[in-house]
């Protein structure tokens, strides 16, 4: 006999069963040493958002705080947390995909937050479709796409950020379609937030391509946010009358732009002024918005058969005085979003390019082309119709091509499924296929970058196997997230390397044979071919580091040492010379991961510390003689003393360029001067030289991190500007008088001889090169001003 359960009991039982199944799944996965993707239950193609959502779901169910009676809860959760830490980080994910866990030995992690953090603080906006969580690699492309963005920079532990979250969600729904609403987690993307000048949370900024970011400082209510946003929306609502009607309509129709017109009679419903403004912003560049006061423009309304309040969309060429015409769209809604969506759906599709004229059309203009097979899949996202307008200033035309009408053409382009591609005005020879998100802002960024870049899509017919010119070739797979992240950086690099080497991409899912020929075992693999020389790139996914890699191939920053040169250059070094040496083996995964960081570090230490490397596979007996017992072994050889063989071994956990440089600089004599209140007053405030001062506190972590950077700065500006340090814990009154409110703080003091006075300025950067460039710029400006003042006298 069956037992009937009521609804609540049934739901509780289902939840219990679901939890049991989830726990069982994780136990099986953890116990069988599955890979990180399996641990989180995501595919290798998962986006950052999907990874966060999967981890949060597991964290809330399996956190040790929720499972106090499970002795294995801590260990099991560490494995899941470790998987998340690696897969959320683009560089670590690339290392893991290429080397597995062996490539992560320098990044052990091992810490996690409380259950309440994952429940209330983690991924605040991941479940809100109207809010786009932006990451560093996509931020600039998004805000420079041409659309208007309002971005919330927040920190997970910030109470004010959580107070704002419900309002931000309501606001996002209110303005959906009018502008893009974004969010940046400064806990995950600290570098991005620092680059954008975010010093407090939440910080709200408006972004649009071509204009400086505008910070919002007003009340955090939905109404105030909407009012502020509307100030930056491009809106033009035209009041139509007998005097301007014909000219306004004909001018727009001639440009291929239709009109949305609301006819208003007193006492009847028509679109409010606020709704008209919103629609004008939402339809900017697509449709003009106007209104007619039929009480004062009676004859105009009668000529258009408008006898009651109504709203209609008139496409270009529509007959206005015949409302029976099927081309006119009458709208019954008074809601801006509903009207917007209905009009967007009714806008014409992109031009269908014919097979016999395709080559000619692509040879004379730059095009963004949607390829489809039979059914046009773009109709599912009507917002893409904005592309034509948003790309107009870039002189990019937008069209579509049906591959079922000419399969041979698509086959020659290696197009075997629906996609979109940019053609650069040279027919079908120069093109690039889009592998990113099929959403408006991502496509816009791709199109703008691609037409101006010099990236060639490679295949068997144009692969530079025997080309005399140097090539940088990226072997990739479209499903691979790190590959997709690298592509925009390659475009940036290609413009800066134009004329020096060529840049191409090869899709290994299509050209498997070519990739196998070059023994490509992981994606992305980026290789420089220079005739017989082949060099694999191992650095971060940034244009800057790609350029550094190319420069290092031309002018190596690391000396490759042999036993003979090691003896001559290191052991017999001059008295004032110092060396840092990396003993490595080519087969060692941590060594491979270290090498690009080692080269990067070497470039920043030019003129200060000599940097070398020894291949212990090639010189095994020599390394044994030098007592090298592990790889990589990093040693610092200080200024020569009576003990020529003295060295210091690096035992730090982090082997990135910044950490290694800080370690090496720590052995050099201090270049800056420690100042007391008396010497600060005498030498800086009353002295006759230029100074840059680091105000710090010994207990301050950022101060400790900045200390070696300041020492590097002191050496870079030696002879031009003196560098000093003031301990604000020991001398608080000196720092208070100097206006210091945070540590570390850097201030520049320039002495003006004519006035015998000191000019001072706060410096916000923490990068030695940036500060040095800023100081030299200020000196040049300062000296020019002094010269002008003399000339005037």
From Swiss-Prot:
**Principal localization?**
endoplasmic reticulum
**Sugar-modified residues:** 530
Pfam families for this protein = DnaJ, Thioredoxin
Q: Identify the SUPFAM superfamilies for this entry.
A: Chaperone J-domain, Thioredoxin-like
User: Which positions carry the signal peptide feature in this UniProt record?
Assistant: 1-32
Alphabetical GO CC annotations of the entry are: endoplasmic reticulum; endoplasmic reticulum chaperone complex; endoplasmic reticulum lumen
- The portions of this protein that span the membrane are none
Region named Trxb 1: 235-350
Q: Which GO terms describe its biological process?
A: ERAD pathway; intrinsic apoptotic signaling pathway in response to endoplasmic reticulum stress; IRE1-mediated unfolded protein response; protein folding in endoplasmic reticulum; response to endoplasmic reticulum stress
Q: Where is the protein situated, by its record's location annotation?
A: Endoplasmic reticulum lumen
Q: Where is the Thioredoxin domain?
A: 130-232, 454-553, 557-665, 671-776
The set of disulfide-linked cysteines is 158-161, 480-483, 588-591, 700-703
**Keyword annotations of the record:** Disulfide bond, Endoplasmic reticulum, Glycoprotein, Oxidoreductase, Redox-active center, Repeat, Signal
Checking InterPro entries in the record gives: DnaJ_domain, ER_disulfide_reductase, ERdj5, ERdj5_TRX_C, ERdj5_TRX_N, J_dom_sf, Thioredoxin-like_sf, Thioredoxin_CS
Q: Where is this motif: Prevents secretion from ER?
A: 790-793
Region annotation (Trxb 2) maps to 348-463
Which ranges carry the J domain? 35-100
Does the record's keyword annotation contain Repeat?
yes
Enzyme Commission number(s): 1.8.4.-
Identify a single GO molecular function assigned to this protein: protein-disulfide reductase activity
Q: What class of enzyme is it?
A: oxidoreductase
**Its biological function?**
Endoplasmic reticulum disulfide reductase involved both in the correct folding of proteins and degradation of misfolded proteins. Required for efficient folding of proteins in the endoplasmic reticulum by catalyzing the removal of non-native disulfide bonds formed during the folding of proteins, such as LDLR. Also involved in endoplasmic reticulum-associated degradation (ERAD) by reducing incorrect disulfide bonds in misfolded glycoproteins recognized by EDEM1.
Entry comment, domain topic: Thioredoxin domains 3 and 4 are the primary reductase domains.
Its quaternary organisation is: Interacts with HSPA5 (via its J domain). Interacts with EDEM1.
Protein known as: DnaJ homolog subfamily C member 10
Organism expressing this protein natively: Rattus norvegicus (Rat)
This protein's encoding gene: Dnajc10
């Amino acid at each position: 006999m069956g037992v009937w359960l009521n609804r609540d009991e049934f739901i509780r039982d289902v939840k219990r069963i679901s939890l049991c199944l989830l726990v069982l799944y994780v136990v099986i996965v953890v116990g069988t040493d599955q890979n990180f993707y399996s641990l989180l239950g995501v595919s290798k193609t998962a986006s950052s958002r999907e990874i966060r959502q999967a981890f949060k779901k597991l964290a809330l169910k399996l956190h040790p705080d929720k499972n106090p009676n499970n002795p294995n809860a801590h260990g099991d959760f560490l494995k899941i947390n470790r998987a998340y830490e690696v897969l959320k980080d683009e560089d670590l994910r690339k290392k893991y995909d290429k080397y597995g866990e062996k490539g992560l030995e320098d990044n052990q992690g091992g810490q996690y937050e409380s259950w309440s953090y994952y429940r209330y603080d983690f991924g605040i906006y991941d479940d809100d479709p109207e809010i786009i969580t932006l990451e560093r690699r996509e931020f600039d492309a998004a805000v420079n796409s041409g659309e208007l963005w309002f971005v919330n920079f927040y920190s997970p532990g910030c109470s004010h950020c959580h107070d704002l979250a419900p309002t931000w969600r309501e606001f996002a729904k209110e303005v959906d379609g009018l502008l893009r609403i974004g969010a940046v987690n400064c806990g995950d993307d600290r570098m991005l937030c620092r680059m954008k000048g975010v010093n407090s949370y939440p910080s709200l900024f408006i972004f649009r391509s071509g204009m400086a970011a505008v910070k919002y400082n007003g009340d955090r209510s939905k109404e105030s946010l909407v009012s502020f946003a509307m100030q930056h929306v491009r809106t033009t609502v035209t009041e139509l009358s007998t005097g301007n009607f014909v000219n306004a309509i004909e001018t727009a129709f001639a440009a291929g732009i239709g009109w949305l017109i609301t006819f208003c009679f007193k006492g009847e419903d028509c679109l409010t002024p606020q709704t008209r403004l919103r629609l004008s912003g939402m339809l900017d560049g697509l449709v003009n918005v106007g209104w007619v006061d039929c009480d004062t423009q009676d004859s105009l309304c009668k000529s258009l058969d408008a006898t009651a309040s109504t709203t209609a969309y008139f496409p270009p060429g529509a007959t206005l005085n015949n409302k029976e015409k099927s081309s006119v769209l009458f709208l019954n809604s008074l809601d801006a979003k509903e009207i917007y969506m209905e009009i967007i759906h009714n806008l014409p599709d992109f031009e269908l390019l014919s097979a016999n004229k395709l080559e000619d059309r692509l040879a004379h203009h730059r095009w963004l082309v949607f390829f489809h097979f039979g059914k046009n899949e773009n109709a599912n996202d009507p917002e893409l119709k904005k592309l034509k307008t948003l790309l107009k200033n870039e002189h990019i035309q937008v069209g579509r091509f049906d591959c079922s009408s000419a399969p041979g053409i698509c086959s020659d382009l290696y197009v075997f499924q629906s996609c979109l591609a940019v053609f650069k005005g040279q027919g079908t020879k120069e093109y690039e296929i889009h592998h990113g998100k099929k959403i408006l802002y991502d496509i816009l960024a791709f199109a703008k970058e691609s037409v101006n870049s010099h990236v060639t899509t490679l295949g068997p017919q144009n692969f530079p196997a025997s080309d005399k010119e140097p090539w940088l070739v990226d072997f990739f797979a479209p499903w691979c997230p790190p590959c997709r992240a690298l592509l925009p950086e390659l475009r940036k690099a290609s413009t800066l390397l134009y004329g020096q080497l060529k840049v191409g991409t090869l899709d290994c899912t299509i050209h498997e044979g070519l990739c196998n020929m070059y023994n490509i075992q992981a994606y992305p693999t980026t290789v420089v071919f220079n005739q017989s020389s082949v060099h694999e790139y191992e650095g971060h996914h940034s244009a800057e580091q790609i350029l550094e890699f190319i420069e290092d191939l031309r002018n190596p920053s690391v000396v490759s040492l042999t036993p003979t040169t090691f003896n001559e250059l290191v052991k017999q070094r001059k008295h004032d010379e110092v060396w840092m040496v990396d003993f490595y083996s080519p087969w060692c995964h941590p060594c491979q991961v270290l090498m690009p960081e080692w080269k990067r570090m070497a470039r920043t230490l030019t003129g200060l510390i000599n940097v070398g490397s020894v291949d212990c596979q090639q010189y095994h007996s020599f390394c044994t003689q030098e007592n090298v017992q592990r790889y990589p072994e990093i040693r610092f050889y200080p200024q020569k003393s009576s003990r020529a063989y003295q060295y210091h071994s690096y035992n730090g956990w982090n082997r990135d360029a910044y950490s290694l440089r800080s370690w090496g600089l720590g052995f050099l004599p201090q270049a800056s001067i420690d100042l007391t209140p008396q010497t600060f007053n005498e030498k800086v405030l009353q002295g006759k030289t230029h100074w840059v001062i680091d105000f710090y506190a010994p207990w301050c972590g950022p101060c400790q991190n900045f200390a070696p950077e300041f020492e590097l700065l002191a050496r870079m500006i030696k002879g031009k500007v003196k560098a000093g340090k003031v301990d604000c814990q020991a001398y608080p009154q000196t720092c208070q008088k100097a206006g210091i409110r945070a540590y570390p703080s850097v201030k520049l003091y320039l002495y003006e001889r004519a006035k015998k006075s000191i000019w001072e300025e706060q410096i916000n950067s923490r990068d030695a090169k940036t500060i040095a460039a800023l100081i030299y710029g200020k000196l040049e400006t300062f000296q020019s001003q002094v010269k002008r003042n003399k000339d005037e006298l």
